[in-house]
Each structure stands twice: as C-alpha cells, then as structure tokens.
Amino acid sequence: LTWIRVWDYASAARVDYFIANSENVAKRIRKHYRREAVVIPPPVRCRLFQLSENDGDYFLVVSRFQEYKRVDIAIDACNKLGLKLKVVGDGPDYRRLKAMAGPTVELLGRVDDAHVKELYAGCRAFLFPGEEDFGITPLEAMASGRPVIAYGKGGALETVVEGVTGTFFKEQTTDSLIDALRRFETMTFDKHKLREHAEKFDDEVFKARIKAFVEEKYNERNGAQE
C-alpha cells in the first residue's frame, strides 16, 4: 500500500483547491494532505419535504443496512423500551437486523420517495446511530419538522443542534441511545424552527456557495495573471 499512499499524496499536491462536505472531512484533509479546505455542506432539497400537523407514534431510521451504520443499536434500544420503530433500507446486514427486530420494530425494506417523505413527516423523531462524514438524512427529517436523535460524532455535530433540532447520545451503544430516548420524552421541539434550520442547507444555498467560491478563485487567479 506504500506506493498508493505516495501516489495519493502526490496527486493531492496537484489539487488547486479542496472543497470538503463537512468540517469533519476538512480536518482529515489537513491531517493527511496538510492542505486547507473550504467547507460547503451538501444540499437537501427542502421543498420536497412537507410539515405535518399530525404526530405519529413511531421513531424512524432511513439507512443502508451495513454494519458501520449501527442500525442494530436503534433496533435493540426500541426492542428494550417497547417503542415503535420503522426502518427503511436494504443491504448486506438485512438478515441480521431482521432477526433482531422485536414486535414493535418494522423493517420496511426499500420504499419509494413519496412514502419516505410521509414517514419523515409522521415520525416522532429520526434516529441516526451511525458516524458519517456528513449525513443528509437528518436534514431531510428536519426539513419535515422532525427532531433527530444522533450519535454525537462525525457530521451530525454540524447539523444537529442540541435541544433545538434534536439531541445526542455520547456512546455508540444501546444503553446510551436508551438514555437519549428517555431524555427525548421530556423535550419539546418547534417544527418550524427545525424546518428553518434545514433551509440553511437547502440546494439553493449550496448552489450559491459553490458559485461564489468558483467565481472568487477564478477572479483571484485571473487577477494574479494580469
């Protein structure tokens, strides 16, 4: 693997500018490439998601079924608390997760976009137990006016605001998530504030930031050559 590292580092040196999708990734760029990166988070199309006046009685996970996503934590916690959980997704971890699911947990498999939007709008909260570089699904939940209960590492720290758009659990364990779910029962959230927060990551904001960055660097380079 040594030659791959050498090639990768040499290739990075030829990059004019780095754009990272999160501060989490920008830190890795600094560490491994010793280069700075501007952070421009990926977009969520807020206009595709709607608020609902009706609160559902279930928690929601939308995820690829892979071990590192830690969907098992969400299933185990809801099993133990007897909470309703709907899980959308598919992947290599499906059989193991299906075997874990108790009577209050429903694995829906793949569903169409319209159904996913309905599930977001009607859930009590969105569970995000994995550690991701950024994570779009929490923002889709917020765009639907629903709070997020997230593992407090990685990209979730850049989208979830404690007590405003959701809450965190500190350890990636069932017990830690159970503590957060119990704490959630005592909390209240304003769905309109959740929506407003998601709109900070709207695709129109993303396009404007990308355009501004490209224009700035283009003008800097052209100005330097004149």
Where are these predicted regions, by residue range?
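Short alpha-helical donor nucleotide-sugar binding micro-motif in glycosyltransferases
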Residues: 118-123, 210
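Short hydrophobic beta-strand element within catalytic cores of glycosyltransferases
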Residues: 127, 147-151, 160
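A charged, aromatic-enriched C-terminal amphipathic alpha-helix characteristic of glycosyltransferases
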Residues: 172, 186-223
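Acidic donor-binding loop of glycosyltransferase active sites
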Residues: 121-133, 146
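Membrane-proximal helix-turn-helix segments that form the acceptor-binding/catalytic region
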Residues: 1-18
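Conserved donor-binding/catalytic core segment of Leloir-type glycosyltransferases
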Residues: 44, 50-69, 75-82, 86
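Nucleotide-activated donor-binding/catalytic signature segment of Leloir-type glycosyltransferases, i.e.
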Residues: 95-117
